[in-house]
């Protein structure tokens, strides 16, 4: 009977796989972004499945147990849908489109593997030589890559739309940076490049051996390893969520002639100050519209047309002016005044203050002729 060999190639892939599964277990325990983290965990599990045929192949599993052939460890047609579902779920509360159909290709691949796995050895050998390797293997590889490319394009466009939504609809845009999602998508782009190089080599030179494809698997393992660490270390708070209606890009309605948008924006500003709503660091346009008993479209027009600003800058301008009043009134601690006026951190306050006033808080205090005991 063939002996198993745990060489360095197997051990390296095993080490990566174990770490990915440990990271997945920690992600499942997180209380925030549970739905998105579930998709990320599944993505890491599918990645481990992708490495498994190589990992056990180098160890001699297929030589010792030929019946393992066609076992559906690698389910690459799930990769693209999981990337899209993760990006969507970080930024939205509803299910990623197109619903259950999103998972159909992956389950087709799984079903095919399960059916072939239980066939006898002679049937497997004939099918592999005449059908699977000439046709289906190429379809699986190219289909998985195409699905991943489509998912990345859709996710990147959605990411850009989300960044624009943050600026227009959330006062937390200055302190909340969705860079983790951007980094995740860039990593997926690098993964696509690695897989694409492998597929191009197969087209140019014919089928590649386990040894020839091993560097691509190591590159993929490194990418997923970095992603797992990034998810554990960087993604520490929930993303502000886009409401369902914001995905539609319908044409705006015509504006009523003669409406005093500037006056309405001024009234809105006074109402926000009177209610102290600007003191809430995570105030959003949908929440403010609800409190005003109006709709978000009308509120956005009031801010955009009346104040000439997006929602984020409109609220932060009110906060900066509140800090300036605190300092003019004798407040000595700049940071304490900033936190009392709706800012969540010193870094965010310094950045927003400089952006709106054109100077740092320290320079502003100096212009007022007062020493700055605390600030930037």
Each language-model region and where it sits:
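Helix-loop junctions on the outward
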Residues: 49-72, 121-128, 201-207
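Hydrophobic transmembrane alpha-helical segments in integral membrane proteins
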Residues: 1-19, 142-145
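The cytoplasmic-loop to transmembrane-helix boundary for the fourth helix
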Residues: 91-118, 132-144, 171-188
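Membrane-interface helix-boundary motifs at transmembrane edges
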Residues: 27-39, 89-100, 164-177, 209-210
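Alpha-helical transmembrane segments
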Residues: 66-67, 134-151, 218-221
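Membrane-proximal linker segments that couple transmembrane helices to downstream signaling/catalytic modules
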Residues: 232-336, 340, 348, 352-355, ...
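Interfacial "cap-and-anchor" motif at the non-cytosolic start of specific transmembrane alpha-helices
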Residues: 189-243
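Hydrophobic alpha-helical transmembrane segments of multi-pass membrane proteins
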Residues: 13-23, 39-58, 79, 112, ...
